[in-house]
């Protein structure tokens, strides 16, 4: 891995780092996650997100390298969609942690899920390993979507909580 490799791995981590630095007091909704018996602890969530962002960055590096590197036209669709989903992923963090808006966060996650699934199909002919590296991301988005949905539902109907 040349110098570009660590850059591709590190860039996805910049968003969460900046968001955490800017958010002085996270939403109280984060504490609500503990009410869900199947929700992982906060440290596990943090570890999984850091791992997924790093793996996602490495996968994008593989695609970039496979298509010849640089900033050429063949990279526009695969890495353009990747950049868009990365921005959506960072937006989810803002909506969920800072804006205290589980409904918008859920909508963001649904769009993100579709984009990541599209990336798997687009990246598969380019680099199979890169596409496979996105599958744990899809699995984690499923868990995150379930948690966010539950928090959104409970915020709409607080008396319906089991």
Curated annotation (Swiss-Prot):
Q: In which tissues is it expressed?
A: Expressed in liver, bone marrow and spleen. In spleen, detected in red pulp but not in white pulp.
Q: Which InterPro entries match?
A: TspO/MBR-related_sf (IPR038330), TspO_MBR (IPR004307)
Q: Which GO terms describe its cellular component?
A: endoplasmic reticulum; endoplasmic reticulum membrane; plasma membrane
Q: Kindly give the Pfam families that the UniProt entry links to this protein.
A: TspO_MBR
Entry's Gene Ontology BP terms: 5-aminolevulinic acid import across plasma membrane; enucleate erythrocyte differentiation; import across plasma membrane; intracellular cholesterol transport; lipid droplet organization
Extract one GO molecular function annotation from the record. Answer: 5-aminolevulinic acid transmembrane transporter activity
Could you say which protein family the record assigns here? Belongs to the TspO/BZRP family.
Know the name of this protein? Translocator protein 2
């Amino acid at each position: 891995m040349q110098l570009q490799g660590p850059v591709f791995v590190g860039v996805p981590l910049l968003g969460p780092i900046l968001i955490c630095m800017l958010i002085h007091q996270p939403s109280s909704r984060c504490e609500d996650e503990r009410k869900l018996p199947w929700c992982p602890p906060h440290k596990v969530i943090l570890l999984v997100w850091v791992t997924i962002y790093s793996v996602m960055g490495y996968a994008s590096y593989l695609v970039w390298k496979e298509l010849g590197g640089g900033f050429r036209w063949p990279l526009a669709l695969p890495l353009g969609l990747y950049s868009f989903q990365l921005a959506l992923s960072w937006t989810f963090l803002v909506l969920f942690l800072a804006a205290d808006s589980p409904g918008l966060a859920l909508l963001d996650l649904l769009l993100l899920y579709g984009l990541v699934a599209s990336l798997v199909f687009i990246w598969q002919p380019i680099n199979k390993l890169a596409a496979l590296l996105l599958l744990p991301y899809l699995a984690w988005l499923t868990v995150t979507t379930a948690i966010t949905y539950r928090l959104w539902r409970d915020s709409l109907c607080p008396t319906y909580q089991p």
